[in-house]
Every structure is written in C-alpha cells, then in structure tokens.
Amino acid sequence: MALERTFSIIKPDATRRNLTGKIIDRFESAGLRVVASKRIHMTKAQAEGFYAVHKERPFFNDLVSFMISGPVVVQVLEGENAVAKNREIMGATNPANADAGTIRKDFAESIEANSVHGSDAPETAAEEIKYFFKDEEIVG
C-alpha cells in the first residue's frame, strides 16, 4: 500500500444540485483526505487545455461546453492507493454500468453529466494536480 494523491473534479451537474458535501463525504468516509480544494468556474481555455487529450474525439466540444456551464470543485485527495480508491468510489464512467453505492450510480444524470472526474493513474494525477494547483496550495 502506498500513500498517494489523486485529482478530482466535482462537475457542474453535481454542484448545481448542491451535492458537493455528499460527494466529499463519500471520499472522506472511504479514507481519502481532501488536501486541496477550490470552487471555480472553468474558462473555455482551461477546459480545452485540461481535456486536450480528447481534442480529436467527437464529444470534445460538448464536454468543454458542459464543463464551463457552471461551477466545479477541483480537489486533491490523499490516501492509500488514492487513485484506485477514488475510481472505485466514483464507479463506471457510464452511470448505467456503475455499481450500486458509487457516486455515479447514486448522483449522475448521464454519461456526460456523471458528477465527478478522477485521475486514471498516478502519473495523470500529478499532471492534473499541477494544472489547477500550486504546490503551496496543497496542505497535507
């Protein structure tokens, strides 16, 4: 077991429905600590940069539009095997395929409006964390 950090976004569909606290409770109840957090309204440029890996995918423009449609909460979560644990808590990308008791099964509206984003690997987490946070903003 390794202590690691992962990156999380609580998406506009969840912030719009005041689910931020309930989602954070899921992370904390599973043993993850929030070591950095801020509520922001992403600019189009921020969203395009963050999701640049998907630039050639057919859903890119819709994803960017959705992510700038309202406030999001960007966070750094820390804990044992944080990346894998967060992905387990979130559930499958498509809420129809997510296990009962996961964030996406319980709160998501659709595959796009699926309430949360989480890093898929420790290397990705490090990149995503640096995209939104300075080192001094992360307090463990």
Swiss-Prot record:
Tell me its EC number(s), please.
2.7.4.6
Binding-site positions, ATP: 11, 59, 87, 93, 104, 114
Gene Ontology biological process terms in this record: CTP biosynthetic process; GTP biosynthetic process; UTP biosynthetic process
> One Pfam family name from the record?
NDK
Description of how the protein assembles with itself and partners: Homotetramer.
Q: Which residues form the active site?
A: 117
The answer to whether keyword Nucleotide-binding applies is: yes
Task: Kindly indicate whether the keyword GTP-binding belongs to this entry.
Answer: no
Query: Which locations, inside or outside the cell, does it occupy?
Result: Cytoplasm
NCBIfam families, alphabetically? PRK00668.1
**Name used for this protein in its record:** Nucleoside diphosphate kinase
The chemistry this enzyme catalyses reads: a 2'-deoxyribonucleoside 5'-diphosphate + ATP = a 2'-deoxyribonucleoside 5'-triphosphate + ADP; a ribonucleoside 5'-diphosphate + ATP = a ribonucleoside 5'-triphosphate + ADP
Q: Which cofactor does it need?
A: Mg(2+)
Function of the protein: Major role in the synthesis of nucleoside triphosphates other than ATP. The ATP gamma phosphate is transferred to the NDP beta phosphate via a ping-pong mechanism, using a phosphorylated active-site intermediate.
Family membership, please give it.
Belongs to the NDK family.
GO MF annotation list: ATP binding; metal ion binding; nucleoside diphosphate kinase activity
The protein's UniProt keywords, in alphabetical order, are:
ATP-binding, Cytoplasm, Kinase, Magnesium, Metal-binding, Nucleotide metabolism, Nucleotide-binding, Phosphoprotein, Transferase
Q: Which domain of life is it from?
A: Bacteria
Q: What is one cellular component GO term in this UniProt entry?
A: cytoplasm
- Which SUPFAM superfamilies is this protein grouped with? Nucleoside diphosphate kinase, NDK
